[in-house]
């Protein structure tokens, strides 16, 4: 089965950006997961790790919840995407 991947073999284009924004805000993966849970998204810190490491595909719903939890526009999560293709 053919799977689309980023140029670096990652399953998403946003994981590195999520990690950078999370670190800029001095949040642990667990704290980011807690923020997402408060928004009604049932995730744990393993979900965050898998996204940041490029192990998990990211849906449009994931992008919206990440943007709300990190208080940034969705476009900010995709800002480095062109370079990774």
What are these regions, as identified by a protein language model?
Residues 1-25:
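A short, Lys/Arg-rich alpha-helix, primarily the initiator
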Residues 2-8, 68, 75-85:
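Short, charged recognition helix plus adjacent turn
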Residues 13-16, 27, 43, 58-61:
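Residue-level signal for the short linker/turn that defines the boundary of a DNA-recognition helix
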Residues 21, 35, 51, 80:
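Residues in the recognition helix of alpha-helical DNA-binding motifs
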Residues 23, 34, 68:
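Alpha-helical residues within the helix-turn-helix
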Residues 26-50:
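Short alpha-helical DNA-recognition segment
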Residues 55, 59-76:
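DNA major-groove recognition helix of helix-turn-helix/homeodomain DNA-binding modules
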